[in-house]
Design a protein with these regions (language model features):
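Conserved class I S-adenosyl-L-methionine
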Residues: 2-63
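Class I SAM-dependent methyltransferase "Motif I" SAM/SAH-binding loop
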Residues: 74-78
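A conserved beta-strand element that flanks and buttresses the S-adenosyl-L-methionine
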Residues: 160
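Acceptor-substrate binding/catalytic loop of class I
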Residues: 168, 208-224
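A short glycine-rich, Lys/Arg-flanked "PGG" loop and its adjoining helix->strand segment in the class I
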Residues: 175-187
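Conserved beta-strand signature within the Rossmann-like core of class I S-adenosyl-L-methionine
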Residues: 188-195
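A C-terminal cap/extension of S-adenosyl-L-methionine-dependent methyltransferases
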Residues: 240-283
């Protein structure tokens, strides 16, 4: 009985090393930085994702009118958080702080540079980026910000993560991440999770499975994405599939995918590229 357990630990450590090597690389920085990322992700941040964030922020503000405190976990080079901060400014919604976390120090450094380059001075003062692992979000955030865990508990209004929660499932620590998010959110606070849909044909392809180890290629179902949040005590307010635009798409492919979206949504929405879970901590 002990032998399989030891093998699993080695596999998990190996996967952690692989992920860290990948997301500390120059390619990762280019992939997740505004100027060098695909047109697809830049479009989504300004439109599809922005609409989701708008609704989540409005849900937060229904129970509190204080200036927002926002956290993005697995923020990469900061594109989503910077986009959200710009969106809040456009909407005239006051922001007290917006923090981004990632386990890659290289991406955190890049995110800080992105904020300097793309945010005005007033907004930039509210934004900071910190090294923290998803599975130890509360503890690592406490250490990196030099704030006691008790000070962070219940201190955020809105938490979100894009294309990061699947790694928690692959490493079997999704419940730990969801519990930490629950702990960090105030009552009435909202979490948004966006990630890859296991039903999208390309993500299920034999070719993809043949070049990746089974555990590294694993994608959760929509039900599996939602379960850790439900178990942590959240109320699920939305769960669905959406988005037909690849993050890496250029201008032409983005335009084609946008044109096809209404037809695809009407016929095969469950096969869309992204899974969405929106959950609220009971007030």
């Amino acid at each position: 009985m002990a032998e399989p357990k030891r093998t699993q630990v080695v596999t998990t450590e190996s996967m952690n090393r692989n992920f860290l090597d990948e997301y500390n690389s120059r390619d990762a920085i280019l992939k997740y930085s505004t100027k060098t990322a695909g047109q697809g992700v830049n479009y989504l941040i300004r439109h599809d994702y922005a609409s989701i964030y708008d609704q989540a922020v409005d849900l937060c503000r229904a129970t509190s009118d204080r200036p927002l405190r926002v956290l993005e976990f697995g923020c990469g080079a900061g594109m989503n958080l910077i986009g959200l901060v710009s969106r809040l400014q456009q909407r005239g919604i006051p922001l007290e702080r917006a923090w981004g976390t990632d386990f890659s120090a290289s991406l955190i450094e890049s995110a800080s540079a992105e904020a300097q380059a793309f945010l005005p001075d007033a907004s930039r003062k509210t934004v900071s980026f910190h090294v923290a692992r998803n599975e130890r979000l509360s503890a690592d955030l406490s250490a990196s910000t030099d704030r006691a865990p008790e000070e962070l508990t219940g201190s955020f209004d809105f938490v979100f993560g894009v294309n990061t929660f699947r790694y928690c499932h692959r490493l079997h620590n999704a419940p730990d991440c969801a519990k930490d998010i629950y702990r960090l959110l105030r009552p009435g606070g909202v979490v948004v999770m966006i990630d890859m849909n296991d039903r999208f044909p390309l993500f299920r392809s034999r070719l993809k499975r043949s070049v990746e180890a089974p555990q590294e290629a694993y994608l959760p179902s929509l039900k599996e994405y939602a379960e850790p949040f439900e178990s942590a005590g959240f109320e699920i307010t939305a769960r669905n599939h959406f988005c037909w635009i690849p993050h890496s798409a250029g201008h032409r492919l983005t335009a084609i995918c946008r044109a096809l979206t209404p037809i695809l949504n009407a016929t095969i929405r469950s096969r869309a590229m992204r899974s969405l879970v929106v959950a609220r901590k009971p007030a």
